[in-house]
Amino acid sequence: MTVLIHVLGSDIPHHNHTVLRFFNDTLAATSEHAREFMVAGEDNGFTESCPALSLRFYGSKKALAQAVIAKAKANRRQRFFFHGQFNTSLWLALLSGGIKPAQFYWHIWGADLYEVSHGLKFRLFYPLRRIAQGRVGCVFATRGDLSYFARQHPDVRGELLYFPTRMDPSLNAMAKERQRAGKLTILVGNSGDRSNQHIAALRAVYQQFGDTVNVVVPMGYPANNQAYIDEVRQAGLALFSDENLQILSEKMEFDAYLALLRQCDLGYFIFARQQGIGTLCLLIQADIPCVLNRDNPFWQDMAEQHLPVLFTTDDLNEQVVREAQRQLASVDKSGITFFSPNYLQPWHNALRIAAGEAE
């Protein structure tokens, strides 16, 4: 029997760390198909912190892709589980036959499914990637992303799977300890990545609420982002008074980020695709409603779990936000499919499907 190999095809430290830690702590002990990884990027202490895993690191996305393709060609029974993706060479290999459909299992993280970049090289590449994605053996994704994908590729198998957000189920009831009143605090975006469209989001918040709310913008990740942070700060100060705008430019530890989220009353996310599910989960856990773009299909997952959804096109005010908070507080968080530990069983199923041990 050939052991399944997991591939982290792009150097995205935060997401890769979350996946590796999840596999090391939760899956590796019970499945031999949860231990082998090929990772784009440097070790950064992963080998030491994840002793249950066998990790190979590659200095570039291209080097990793070449190694994956070589393994795929050497043994056509070898199967790969691609997490996220973001690696052009791997899509082209699937397109050209270097990797066969029966070898390619893909967990969609959102960004690599959607066609939102306007650069020429992206516009030229998207049609090729779209064809390649139709050759995937099986995709794993959120309900909304599965629906989006199926419209383009109805013949490709799709299975429900959620990114393993780091969550403590014991915190499900903590939100009720806080009395929510007074000036609203609104979280804008889930990171400093430009995909959050921070400036457009700040303008949208201002249009809805004016300079009457506290606005918090976490931008400590990714690194080397100061020019964009300054751009966002300048745009924000043109709308909000200094005491109402908090731009966080330093990377935060998880517990500090969790504490920050729990001081908020509303999350505001205008990106037109599924992303930031970790932040959304932590906000929902704390009874903090989220404003989504109608083109972000994750609203389907929230509606399926009977969670209130606010949209950027809604007329928002404090009364609407407080009512959404009340509705969230009435939801039994222990039953939400995309919360820990409920997302665990689909991961066990996904491993068996990708390894060829389940129909």
From Swiss-Prot:
<dbReference type="GO" id="GO:0102031">
    <property type="term" value="F:4-acetamido-4,6-dideoxy-D-galactose transferase activity"/>
</dbReference>
<dbReference type="InterPro" id="IPR009993">
    <property type="entry name" value="WecF"/>
</dbReference>
<comment type="similarity">
    <text>Belongs to the glycosyltransferase 56 family.</text>
</comment>
<keyword id="KW-0328">Glycosyltransferase</keyword>
<comment type="function">
    <text>Catalyzes the synthesis of Und-PP-GlcNAc-ManNAcA-Fuc4NAc (Lipid III), the third lipid-linked intermediate involved in ECA synthesis.</text>
</comment>
<dbReference type="GO" id="GO:0036065">
    <property type="term" value="P:fucosylation"/>
</dbReference>
<comment type="pathway">
    <text>Bacterial outer membrane biogenesis; enterobacterial common antigen biosynthesis.</text>
</comment>
<dbReference type="Pfam" id="PF07429">
    <property type="entry name" value="Glyco_transf_56"/>
</dbReference>
<protein>
    <recommendedName>
        <fullName>TDP-N-acetylfucosamine:lipid II N-acetylfucosaminyltransferase</fullName>
        <ecNumber>2.4.1.325</ecNumber>
    </recommendedName>
</protein>
<keyword id="KW-0997">Cell inner membrane</keyword>
<keyword id="KW-0808">Transferase</keyword>
<dbReference type="GO" id="GO:0009246">
    <property type="term" value="P:enterobacterial common antigen biosynthetic process"/>
</dbReference>
<keyword id="KW-1003">Cell membrane</keyword>
<dbReference type="GO" id="GO:0005886">
    <property type="term" value="C:plasma membrane"/>
</dbReference>
<dbReference type="GO" id="GO:0008417">
    <property type="term" value="F:fucosyltransferase activity"/>
</dbReference>
<keyword id="KW-0472">Membrane</keyword>
